[in-house]
Amino acid sequence: MDRVLLRWISLFWLTAMVEGLQVTVPDKKKVAMLFQPTVLRCHFSTSSHQPAVVQWKFKSYCQDRMGESLGMSSTRAQSLSKRNLEWDPYLDCLDSRRTVRVVASKQGSTVTLGDFYRGREITIVHDADLQIGKLMWGDSGLYYCIITTPDDLEGKNEDSVELLVLGRTGLLADLLPSFAVEIMPEWVFVGLVLLGVFLFFVLVGICWCQCCPHSCCCYVRCPCCPDSCCCPQALYEAGKAAKAGYPPSVSGVPGPYSIPSVPLGGAPSSGMLMDKPHPPPLAPSDSTGGSHSVRKGYRIQADKERDSMKVLYYVEKELAQFDPARRMRGRYNNTISELSSLHEEDSNFRQSFHQMRSKQFPVSGDLESNPDYWSGVMGGSSGASRGPSAMEYNKEDRESFRHSQPRSKSEMLSRKNFATGVPAVSMDELAAFADSYGQRPRRADGNSHEARGGSRFERSESRAHSGFYQDDSLEEYYGQRSRSREPLTDADRGWAFSPARRRPAEDAHLPRLVSRTPGTAPKYDHSYLGSARERQARPEGASRGGSLETPSKRSAQLGPRSASYYAWSPPGTYKAGSSQDDQEDASDDALPPYSELELTRGPSYRGRDLPYHSNSEKKRKKEPAKKTNDFPTRMSLVV
């Protein structure tokens, strides 16, 4: 009986073991590489017909594996492992001392990831296998596979596997992970790229310096713009020539004064071109030729006391300050003509001709034979003692020196040719006119009184002309002048006379005729001829009393333009006044203005008044002479 009972108990136990839950993991420890995929396998068996719930948990190491690899494990852990051979100090510890996380869980076909592993390539495949896409450094640890069934509670429902994540050692890191170079190593390719970028920036810097007006490293030819270098190539060649000691050969450069429509002249002074008063040490080349000979360039004298680079820097500084427009302005604006230089020292233009004659002009003939003059101007400031003597300067050297000196504008202009036979007003004639105008000799006969009376009458007539402009409005007078483009005539200025000349006494009664138009012969005034005929027809007393209508007045009646064309001063026919009045009038008279415009006026605009003059002559001959003033005559004063 007892034997039968024992057999049934053993059979029941065997049946329970076969029908219970069993979970197994084929690999207890697995090693995987970093950033590589891996699969942790898990198998289970159950007698339940309902779907099981699969869950994977992660438990970190109890101790860091890094200390074990470096030999830094504690002595206590080693002693415990020796006592219990089945106990592992890295895996066997309480869950409170390490990190525990749910990796993933599967129920049916639904997979749910834990909070820490969301977003990663992790899933449960097959029945209970855990698949990880890319391993990370924190994935090393202990993974547990847990199977849960609702109607099978007996058996072993979990098992664990150790995962160790390792990295590659002994290999260089990948410089270009997503780019593969097959023809060369990656480090060679990266080095070539960096070198090319550096050379590109160097080329851009050279082109920027050479092609733009900045401080640059000169004499480096830029390949992108070789013709636009900012460095002075000519100055560089001049510096090399200065060091070598021979003149540089510069071809293709035109002359500095070969400008069309501009009169040729000498070279401007050094002060006109540059502000610096000290010129560089230049010496003229050996060129012995006339004014038409071609001169060579200048060569820089070698000086042992000065460094050659100082000369180069000086020339570069002077070229930087050079202004061609300033040179042209100074060439025409700084020249002073001979006529304007007469009044350079004294601003009073109404000075007498004796003071102007007192200034002696230099004579060119005296300078030709003056050795001190040529030794001073051609020898420089060093003096005649150090320079060559005056006899060494021949005629060709003097002519070359004259052509090299700057000339005034009036010397460069062409001279005007006056017609032959026209009396020119020279300084001697002006001086004689000043003597006769201001200081007339007094004679006791009647002719002197008549002359004084005539001159007084002309002055009163000129005052009457000036009074005409004073009585009328200035706007009307200047309006008439502004509408006329012709220059002022002698009558407009208020004076009509000619320089007095010494003539015989028998020709004193004849009129003095002056033609102020170049190129025309002197012409007689027909009004004076008519007045002479009238005096012959009148009785003697009337002729002695004198006609109050003088030729000067008739010339004023003819118009200002006709009076200026036939400008003359006849002998006076009226005796009045005293010596005191004559002295006062002579002292009040001022010299007329003088200009070159009187001689340069052509007969073109004066010839247009000739028909008007002829018509006025006909009217004057038809009308009888009338008294135009109330001056008392000599006969009316006789009691």
From Swiss-Prot:
Highest taxon listed in the record's lineage: Eukaryota
Membrane topology: Single-pass type I membrane protein
GO biological process: cell differentiation; homeostasis of number of cells within a tissue; insulin secretion; negative regulation of T cell activation; pancreas development; regulation of RNA splicing; response to glucose
Modified sites of kind Phosphoserine: S473, S579
Lumenal side: 21-186
One annotated Gene Ontology cellular component of this protein: membrane
Record topological domains on the Cytoplasmic side: 208-639
Segments passing through the bilayer: 187-207
Subcellular localization, as worded in the UniProt entry: Endoplasmic reticulum membrane; Cell junction, Tight junction; Nucleus
Domain (Ig-like V-type) ranges: 21-162
Composition bias type Basic and acidic residues, residue spans: 393-414, 442-464, 483-493, 606-617
Keyword field contains Hydrolase: no
Leader sequence residues: 1-20
Tissues where this protein is expressed: Expressed in testis, brain, pituitary, colon, heart, nerves, prostate, esophagus, lung liver and small intestine. Highly expressed in macrophages, also expressed in monocytes and at low levels in NK and NKT cells (at protein level).
Quaternary context: Interacts with MARVELD2 and OCLN. Interacts with P4HB AND HSPA5; the interaction with HSPA5 stabilizes ILDR2 expression. Interacts (via C-terminus) with TRA2A, TRA2B and SRSF1.
Name of the protein: Immunoglobulin-like domain-containing receptor 2
Native organism: Homo sapiens (Human)
Lineage: Eukaryota, Metazoa, Chordata, Craniata, Vertebrata
Gene behind this protein: ILDR2
